[in-house]
C-alpha cells in the first residue's frame, strides 16, 4: 500500500512553547518539499499551555505553510510512557519514513527531507549527526515496514536506545548527512525549561523497568528475529544477525565502530534459572573489540 507522505515527524510535546515553535519552524523552513511531510503531534489532554500554544501559534503557521498535520490528545502517560506516545503516533502516520522527533530538537540542514528520501525503498534505520556523535540514533528514522512488522516502535521508554540497539544487531544503521541540535535540558542546563531533567531508565539491570533488564533485552531479540525474517524474504543481508545469534559475532561490534568518542560501555550479567540478575560487570570482550577496531 502506498503511503500519502514521504516523512512523518512524530512529536510528543508537553508545556514547551517557544522551544516547540523553534523545533517546528526549523523542520518546515529547511525542508525542500513540505507537501511530502506530515507532522504528528501528541499532547496530554491536561496540558492547557501546550494546547493553547498549538492552536494560537503552531496551527496557524502550519496552515499558512500548507503543511499536513494531525494533533492527538492523550491521557497523560508521563515520561515513563514516552514510547507509548510514539507508538500511537506511528500507528496513525501515513508516510514512508517515521521520524522520531523531540520538541527540544532543532533541524540544521537545508533540504534534510531530500537526504532522507534518497534512502526510500531501503530497509535502514537512519541516524543524524547530534549529541557529540553519540553512537545511537538519538532521533531514529525508520521505514514504515519496521512498525508494521513489530506493531510498535519501541516496547521500552528509551525509544532511541531500543531502536538503535536493534539496528546494530541487524546491521541496518545508516548515518546520513543531516545535522540536528538537541537542546536537552540535561545538556544545556537551562534553568528556565519547564521540564526538568528526567529519571533515567537504565543503570540497574535488576529492576524490571530498566532498559537492560534481561527480559527486556530478550524482547528486543524477539523483535529482531521478526525483522530478520522479513529481510531474508526480501533478499537483504542478515549475516551479522545470524552471526550474533550463533555466537560467532560479538553483538555490539557495530555499535563500538560508531562510538568514536567512547560514550558507551558494555557489561555482562549473570542470571539464575528464573532470569533474575545475580551480578553484572564490565564486558572485557568489548574493550578487546575496541582495540582490534582501533588498529
Residue ranges with predicted function:
Residues 95-106:
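Short beta-strand-to-loop acidic/aromatic patch adjacent to the donor-nucleotide binding site
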Residues 41-56, 105-106:
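A conserved acidic beta->alpha catalytic loop
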Residues 161-295:
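C-terminal catalytic/acceptor-binding lobe
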Residues 124-140:
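Short beta-strand-to-loop element that shapes/binds the nucleotide-sugar donor at the catalytic cleft/hinge
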Residues 35-48, 72-76:
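Short beta-strand/loop segment that forms part of the nucleotide-sugar
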Residues 110-128:
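Conserved donor-nucleotide/metal-binding helix-loop-beta segment in metal-dependent transferases, i.e.
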Residues 50-93:
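Active-site-proximal specificity loops/subdomain of glycosyltransferases
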Residues 25-36:
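Short, acidic, metal-binding catalytic loop of nucleotide-sugar glycosyltransferases
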